Amino acid sequence: TETRPKLLREAAVGNIAHDPNGHGYQPYVGIPELRKGFAAWYQRWYGVDLNPNTEIQPLIGSKEGILHVTLAFVNPGEQVLVPNPGYPTYTSLSKILGAEVINYDLKEEDGWMPDFETLENMDLGRVKLMWTNYPNMPTGANATPELYERLVDFARRKNLVIVNDNPYSFILNEKPISILSVPGAKECCIEFNSMSKSHNMPGWRIGMLASNPEFVQWILKVKSNIDSGMFRAMQLAAATALEAEADWYDGNNRNYRNRRHLAGEIMKALGCTYDEKQVGMFLWGK
């Protein structure tokens, strides 16, 4: 079954064949068409207004953003809060760059949400970043508006930056939400997104981050010393793919539901239990 937007393939072929500027260096900030595409996508699906010129930074996949953000915000010896369980790269890159990792536990009895009472009682004087990831890898827990409101309030009061990794919000999820929908969140939050997950195109390496203009400029200062931009044809094709209609996402999720059902049957055959309300691309059981 075709699991990528048809218009992505058509746009890619056309752009590679006919764009005479496609073989040169591209802007560090990404081409305007892609930035505008991400801005329109965020407005349409998350209800979040982003300035495409100052509040969006395309990435060569959102994974590289973990490196860029850590370099921009954390000095060696400073601390970062990392969820446990969680994406291993938050921990490994922090350690490589000399930061101290402080785990905060996500527990089943709390719905795999942060325990704010425990966090409030921690010494956070050296903490610069707090990594969050919803829909969560690997537990499948989904975010709520209330969770995002609490995280923004926590970041403001504790003078730290929340980095919300949000690549799975279109997978088996009725209503994608963004932490940036919380009023004032841009002041203290950065959000990642990834077309690897939302549009099934991991080999294209197209992601993005969004935040306030000052944070974006700090990150761009790091990024511009690491790479020299993405292939123009891929950026143009990605901008076109961001125009996919709801029926494409619905069809994609039908495929995921079929796969989730098969995975669930395997789990049951093994005597495992799991929460059927999980969203995203993981099935977490025991």
Model-derived features: where do they sit?
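Structural signature of PLP-dependent enzymes
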Residues: I219-I226, A241-E265
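A short helix->loop->beta-strand "cap" motif at the edges of active sites that frequently abuts
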Residues: E78, A99, R157-V161, A185-E187
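Conserved PLP-anchoring active-site segment centered on the Schiff-base-forming lysine
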Residues: A72-S94
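Active-site phosphate-binding strand-loop segment of PLP-dependent enzymes
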Residues: I102, L106-I177
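N-terminal small-domain helix-loop-helix segment of the aminotransferase-like
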Residues: T1-G61, H68, L242-A244
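Conserved glycine-rich beta-strand-loop-beta hairpin in the small C-terminal domain of fold type I
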Residues: A239, Y256-M267, Y274-K286
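Active-site PLP attachment segment
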Residues: V182-W218, M230
